[in-house]
Design a protein with these regions (language model features):
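TM-adjacent membrane-interface loops and short helices in multi-pass inner/ER membrane proteins
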Residues: 137, 141-185, 196-200
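Ubiquitous "structural anchor" signal
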Residues: 94, 111, 155, 163, ...
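Intrinsically disordered, low-complexity Ser/Thr/Pro-rich tracts
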Residues: 115, 261-262
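Hydrophobic alpha-helical transmembrane segments of multi-pass inner membrane proteins, especially
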Residues: 1-151, 190-247
Length: 268
């Protein structure tokens, strides 16, 4: 599955559809496929299978670390080149979580973290100006209320206007009067909160918790190490994707396109 998705990523990078400055979709006529979304799951499956087979060896051997890193870096490089910084970060997080769950020594994560901190200024220098601006606007949306901070401000207004029980299905003003252009993806939770209010949002969170609990429980009761590792990794990934989507981090273009509501519905 990983190899297939990797080939789709290469195809998208070479012959894919370009929209909003990014070449990341494949036209299947009846739908546009974004392979980078599939890679979030493919990397979990691949790592779970790899460490299932590596049980007879030490997971902390050099080869047991370097091979997964190579497997992880290849799709990240392709996704960044599209460009899609946010999805590449989410793919990296998916892989890193499985590495941690597989029992990789904490020292590798510490060293990697130090390298990341040291190289951060160098990495930031490669960000597009609009990406830097949106990160700054996420930290302080009021600095540009009619520009890069617009959606975050409108998102807060929408959530607040939903009140306790919301305005009702398809009756949200911020969403359907186009104050939130990305309401169907980046700000889907905002739209939901406006229509169903605080109570509806809490119910949605409970549903998410139940789904994640069931996934983890299936893994805990599984006799297969592959199934156990996949379920734990998948549950952790969904939790991270939901957190990012709900915290509106996605608008900094650390995008979480369809990472919560859509991904869970499509896969489960």
């Amino acid at each position: 599955f990983y190899t297939l998705v990797l080939l789709l990523l290469i195809w998208a990078s070479l012959y894919g559809i370009t929209a909003s400055g990014s070449q990341r979709w494949i036209n299947l006529y009846f739908i546009n496929l974004q392979p980078s979304e599939l890679m979030k799951i493919a990397i979990i499956i691949c790592f779970a299978k790899y460490y299932h087979r590596a049980q007879m060896y030490s997971v902390n051997k050099f080869t047991s670390i370097i091979i997964p890193i190579i497997i992880l870096v290849l799709p990240i490089f392709l996704v960044i080149s599209q460009p899609d910084l946010g999805t590449s970060i989410l793919i990296a997080l998916s892989g890193i979580m499985v590495l941690w769950l597989a029992g990789v020594n904490i020292k590798y994560f510490v060293v990697s973290g130090l390298i990341l901190v040291i190289t951060a200024p160098f990495v930031i220098s490669f960000l597009q100006p609009y990406q830097k601006l949106r990160i700054l606007s996420f930290l302080n949306p009021d600095r540009d209320p009619l520009g890069s901070g617009y959606q975050i401000i409108q998102s807060k207004i929408a959530i607040g206007s939903g009140g306790l029980f919301g305005k009702g299905f398809l009756k949200g003003t911020q969403g359907y009067l186009e104050f939130l252009p990305e309401k169907h993806t980046d700000f889907i939770f905002t739209l939901f909160s406006e229509e169903f209010g605080f109570v509806g949002s809490v119910v949605l969170l409970v549903i998410y918790i139940i789904i994640i609990y069931r996934i983890v429980a299936i893994g805990a009761n599984s006799r297969s190490y592959f199934a156990k590792l996949f379920c734990y990794g998948f549950g952790a990934a969904i939790f991270v994707f939901i957190t990012i989507n709900m915290s509106t981090v996605s608008y900094t273009h650390l995008r979480a396109h369809e990472t919560s509501l859509h991904l869970v519905c499509r896969l489960l």
